[in-house]
Amino acid sequence: MSKALLAAWRINSLAPAPYPERLDTNDNALDRFLGSSLGQARLWASHLRLKRLRSFADKVVHRSNALSALSEAELAACVDDLRVKLARQGLTEDLTIEVFSLVREVCGRKLGLRHFPVQLIGGRVILAGKLAEMQTGEGKSLTAVLPAIAVALSGLPVHVITVNEYLVRRDARFMRPVYEFFGLDVGMVVPDQDPETRRNAYGCDVTYCVNKDLVFDYLRDRIDSNRDVSDARRAVARLFRGDENSRAYLRGLFFGIVDEADSVLIDEARTPLIISSSVSDKQGVDDYRRALDFCRQLRDGLHFRIFAADKLIQLTPAGRDHITNICGNLPGVWQVARARFELIEQALAAQLLYMRDKHYIVKDEKVQIVDEYTGRVMSDRTWESGLHQMIEVKEGCALTDRRKTISRITYQRFFRRYLRLGGMTGTAAEVVGELSAIFGLDVLRIPTNRAVQRKNLGTRIFLDTASRWDAVLKSIRRVRDEGRPVLIGTRSVAASEHLSSLLKTEGIEHSVINARQDEDEATVVEQAGRVGRVTVATNMAGRGTDIKLESGVSDRGGLHVILSEFHESPRIDRQLYGRAGRQGDKGSYESIVSLEDELFVLFSGEMARRVMSNSSFSNVITGMKAKLLRGSAQRSSERYYSRIRRQTVLEDQRLAKMLAFAGRGE
């Protein structure tokens, strides 16, 4: 292990800081270019580094096999001895081998699972502050235990960060016996916890948490401890208040292990996370209703322009004139030009860009936002600038208070503050340059433990949505008749429920997982690998979902996955495909989509229109033409969203400078 890594884990070097975290740095364009280029080069050279890591894994396996002869008491004594050595020496290479060997043996005894060499390599990569690209189904949750215990035994807090509450509960509960054997306590941060329970969870040696919850708790700490003022003022405050960290949720940002790292660090990094407070709303229900009524009189292209990818609508000069004419005699907000135009633009967005059962659901007479990446409800989140209230009026729900921003931070800024950050994902190759340039994270591609037997049955792009669903139904019948389970992935609640209604009409028994039907998620996932089982799911059944096959299913061909709509990135598609053919099992997948899907409409509109109007095509596009059409749309989408993320970083840096000049933080 390098001297730099060894120094990073010496407890004494970190102890004096009341809230340890890395200082912000502002990289210039050259830094980002060099970081991106180096990241791509290092990924390409992954195989050159694997030889040394395989030697490390072999030593761990050899030492672990020797430990198998020890009794429980003797194994516990080894743990006690290891603690003393770690306190004296830090995480040397030899002690890392010892830790991993003990963890492997304890996992075998407590869980019935012993790490494969590729998982040991993955754990070592994460411990070194890098990303391990491990294919779906290769046991990333078990891999994360290795670096988590190694660092926690050294006396430093560890955050295991994942994408949803289901995975937090599953992994923390399943791994608890292993942590407890090492004398480590494990906490879970989940929604709806009271503050004291949440503080206790962060006070544990290892804390499992969802990325959004973690960042919001960090922002709360900064608000509560006045960390948004200058260093000098904080020092004075500590003299009078004592330890400013005593009531904080977190103990600092020591070591973070990010599961599904590309989702957290890339896909969800387009917009900042904001903490807000309620403010009195100058607009009432009548103003919102009036705005919704007025916008129905406006025509696309003449009075306003839609920028669907940006979720933005702008009034044209003709539209502004029209609104001014029809509301000139109205009182209040309608007399202020900027305010009335913003109100109309929000009404247009609520009507045309934010769709029920896609971007939100109405549950218990409340508008609840659906996370587009996880497919899950974010019940405590709201849209800003009056948009949420506009949608509430649109749906006939009770009006909630508007919100005022009091603290904000981007994912890019937050995760760069960890003293050490590592992670894992099955899909990092396409964004390795950005991960390296922004977060300083190198990616190492880890080979699979067994040969992958997942078959690609191809892509079919239909000209219309109805034809797509007909083809999906036929494929479901075929696979079910073979006695194989089938998982159909959709991108929205509405699409999943539409397919469910079609299946009911056909008399096909099935289960549904979406933001509205999530109470029995664990049971549905548990049964999804049974003979002839049909499961319809949004992205809730994507990342991290482990569908175990019933005995005999693999011999019939395994789980079959149908993707019914492409995502903006092929990485997200591959996550769904990866539910099949895990750990060497047989499996297959296919894509059955429509040119009317959002990806093609937004990012391949002209090409899609030419295809649809070309009589030489039949009702379906397959083969190389389908591959080219998909590739063109997804490349355009990825370039667009990459620019958005770069702009987010630059805007964040500019805002930070302005706030620093004013003596404030986030």
From Swiss-Prot:
One MF term in the entry's GO annotations: protein-exporting ATPase activity
Entry keyword set: ATP-binding, Cell inner membrane, Cell membrane, Cytoplasm, Membrane, Nucleotide-binding, Protein transport, Translocase, Translocation, Transport
EC number: 7.4.2.8
Membrane topology (UniProt): Peripheral membrane protein
Catalytic activity: ATP + H2O + cellular proteinSide 1 = ADP + phosphate + cellular proteinSide 2
InterPro entries in the record: Helicase_ATP-bd, Helicase_C-like, P-loop_NTPase, SecA, SecA_CS, SecA_DEAD, SecA_motor_DEAD, SecA_preprotein_X-link_dom
Record has Lipid metabolism as a keyword: no
A GO term from the CC aspect: cytosol
Record bears the keyword NAD: no
Pfam families: P-loop_SecA, SecA_DEAD, SecA_PP_bind
Residues that bind ATP: Q119, G137, E138, G139, K140, S141, D546
GO biological process: intracellular protein transmembrane transport; protein import; protein targeting; protein transport by the Sec complex
CDD domains, alphabetized: DEXDc_SecA (cd17928), SF2_C_secA (cd18803)
UniProt subcellular location: Cell inner membrane; Cytoplasm
HAMAP family attached to this UniProt entry: SecA
PANTHER family: CHLOROPLAST PROTEIN-TRANSPORTING ATPASE, SECA INNER MEMBRANE COMPONENT OF SEC PROTEIN SECRETION SYSTEM
Job of this protein: Part of the Sec protein translocase complex. Interacts with the SecYEG preprotein conducting channel. Has a central role in coupling the hydrolysis of ATP to the transfer of proteins into and across the cell membrane, serving both as a receptor for the preprotein-SecB complex and as an ATP-driven molecular motor driving the stepwise translocation of polypeptide chains across the membrane.
Record note on quaternary structure: Monomer and homodimer. Part of the essential Sec protein translocation apparatus which comprises SecA, SecYEG and auxiliary proteins SecDF-YajC and YidC.
Family membership noted in the UniProt record: Belongs to the SecA family.
Protein name: Protein translocase subunit SecA 2
Annotated source species: Nitrosospira multiformis (strain ATCC 25196 / NCIMB 11849 / C 71)
